[in-house]
Amino acid sequence: MSFVSFSTMAYSDVAEVYQWEAFPGKSMEMMESMMKAASIHEKQGATVAIDLHNIGSTQLVNYVLRWDDSKSYAASKDIQASSQEWVEFWAEANQNPSGEMTASFSANNLDQTRKASDFEGSYVYSVAVWDVESGKDLDLIQRFMTSKPILERAGARVEIYQANWGAPGEYHYVLMFDSWAALEESFSKLGPGSEWASYMQSTADDEVIAEQTAFFTGQTAN
């Protein structure tokens, strides 16, 4: 974990992401189980989003927990560790499993003004996952911050996360929209002759400091 992660952890919204894949014919059962889990997590201080992967992925489901800051995160985790509700939940879930977890990681928003409540409600999104070269974090963040207002002017809400436990060296560049129509309208403004196209052309010869490892869309289910 880089020093950037430590500096943002105390102040920005903290997220944990659990990626699940339903067993064949068990998608509805897995969603029902996630809804039950969400009600427990919310009582214990977390904000929960259940995100369905779309194009570019393999029908995975992200179970996302958010807290306002690291202190809220730690307090909630301590409650979970001694919760009888979780003992009972997992005893029931393990009797008839509906899916398997394929990955998990935590991440912090680079915008230290963001709170967990800023992510309530329904939305669709596009996310690009980047794996940064060692020692190039600040350079990559600078590029993200330069591109962010361009995409915002095209209609996207931009959130940038630095992953730590579970996915060190990863950055998740997330574009959020109210609907698929809004996503399409925004992306239609990024073609030839656009401000985005000019920016991409101006950076074409820049040093390669990160590799894009994933690019997919999705939407919330709760």
What do the PLM-derived regions correspond to, one by one?
Residues 1-5:
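Bacterial N-terminal signal peptides
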Residues 10-222:
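Short S/T/G/P-rich N-terminal loop/turn motif that feeds into the first structured element of a domain
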